[in-house]
Swiss-Prot record:
Cofactor: FAD
GO CC term, one of those recorded: plasma membrane
GO biological process: D-alanine catabolic process
EC number: 1.4.99.-
Organism from which the protein derives: Bordetella bronchiseptica (strain ATCC BAA-588 / NCTC 13252 / RB50)
Protein's job: Oxidative deamination of D-amino acids.
Primary gene name: dadA
Official protein name in the record: D-amino acid dehydrogenase
Length: 434
């Protein structure tokens, strides 16, 4: 069986790897010069099932209003000129009830925990190295109110059997010794010992090499011009003036998947949420984190790689705008200087931005479509690295006709009632970016 995977970020590359492991002939099409060159390039570095929390949550609408007037707000909404942006926001607001929050968080935790297990198995099987650390994650609270609000998430963690430690201020240095210098700014934290960290781009580059060793063909610098659809099936991919045909197809174009598949009558509720990061050369190991923290106030993560510190986070809903904004850099610098002063050469940092493909319920879209041989793997939002291996394994199982190890039906596009019925004729979609 021949499968074409569209996209070679961490999602597309893990999908290709797991398909090849199951004996499929795999071709990956990517417009960039190599894997992990866009959204997977500079993310926060956290593999954090325990923090798999929906953005759509009770209280978020009120918080969003307050954030509009804050200089270092974690969320910013800027009109992109489209009606779709407001339709997507309305759908997100509809998921902010306590009931929807619980349903969505359970789905996210289920996939994220499974994905972490898949990552560990893959690491044991391949020996892949990506500056990984398995020392847990620590969510930091600056106020007592944040500590109290965390108890709602703790209830879900307990229900799902996820280990945790709730730490008061004085116990924070037991997890992150460098925080001893910043205790006066903190109220406490929530530690998740089973979470991990690692450089997503390095992982993806190495996994691509291992996929090639299994026979996967990567075709880079390829502009996908469209899909041909006939009789309820994808008949081929138009790329570089030629048509490539396969038995199955997987769309993993991240934020661009919606626009790519829209001409086919598939309505994917995916919106690009812009995030930022700094990658800082470490100068003082004793002042740096040993693993990773998430600052609940600013929604910014600070993660330790071998000799680098990655500071990432924030969310802008502003369409496909990839301009770097100095104000966002200042927020990232504020957090790392506040919590880990003197840990790195901030002035030498690489400043980066990328677009995360977010759904209104924060749960990815994984699985079949109304076209019998077209599958989706997109919409992971801020958790693409966390959910990558599990998502790749799930899609590979579905494509190859195997029973997935976890429930996956509620991850499919059909949960939105989107897409209608497959039709005949030819549909073509332009791929403007991958």
């Amino acid at each position: 069986m021949h499968v074409i995977v569209l996209g070679s970020g961490v999602i597309g590359t893990t999908t290709a790897y797991y398909l090849a492991r199951q004996g499929a002939q795999v071709t990956v099409l990517e417009r960039r010069a190599g894997p992990a060159d866009e959204t997977s390039y500079g993310n926060a570095g956290q593999v954090s099932p325990g923090y798999s929390t929906p953005w759509a949550a009770p209280g978020i609408p009120l918080k969003a209003l307050k954030w509009m007037f804050q200089k270092h707000a974690p969320l910013a909404i800027r009109a992109d000129g489209s009606f779709y942006q407001w339709r997507w926001l309305a759908a997100m607001l509809a998921n902010c009830s306590a009931g929807r929050y619980s349903v969505n968080k359970e789905r996210m935790l289920r996939l994220a925990e499974y994905s972490r297990d898949c990552l560990r198995t893959l690491r044991a099987d391949t020996g892949i190295q990506y500056e990984q650390r398995t020392q847990g994650t620590l969510q930091l609270f600056r106020t007592a109110a944040q500590m109290e609000a965390a108890r709602r998430d703790i209830a879900v963690l307990e229900e799902c059997g996820v280990p945790y430690e709730l730490l008061d201020r004085n116990r924070l240095p037991t997890a992150e010794p460098a925080l001893a210098r910043a205790l006066d700014k903190l109220a406490g934290g929530l530690r998740l010992p089973n979470d991990e960290t690692g450089d997503c781009r390095r992982f993806t580059l190495q996994l691509a090499d291992k996929a090639k060793a299994l026979g996967v063909q990567f075709r880079f610098n390829q502009q996908v011009e469209g899909l041909d659809v006939r009789g309820g099936q994808v008949a081929g991919v138009r790329v570089g003036g030629e048509q490539l045909a396969a038995d199955r197809y997987v769309a993993a174009f991240g934020s661009y998947t919606r626009g790519f598949l829209r001409p086919l009558g598939l309505d994917l509720p995916v919106y690009p949420v812009k995030g930022y990061s700094l990658t800082i050369p470490m100068t003082d190991e004793s002042a740096a984190p040993v693993s990773t923290i998430l600052d609940e106030t600013y929604k910014v993560a600070v993660t330790r790689f071998d000799q680098r510190i990655r500071v990432g986070g924030m969310a802008e809903l502003a369409g496909f705008d990839l301009r770097l904004k100095e104000a966002r850099r200042k927020t990232l610098e504020l957090v790392v200087n506040d919590l880990f002063p003197g840990s790195g050469a901030v002035e030498q940092a690489e400043f980066w931005t990328g677009l995360r493909p977010m759904t209104p319920d924060s749960t990815p879209i994984i699985g079949a479509t109304k076209y019998g041989n077209l599958f989706l793997n997109t919409g992971h939002g801020t958790l693409g690295w966390t959910m990558a291996c599990g998502s790749g394994q799930l899609v590979a199982d579905q494509v190859c006709g195997r029973q997935p190890a976890i429930r996956a039906d509620d991850l499919a596009l059909s949960r939105y009632g989107a897409g209608g019925q497959a039709g005949g004729g030819v549909a073509r979609a332009q791929h403007n970016a991958a």
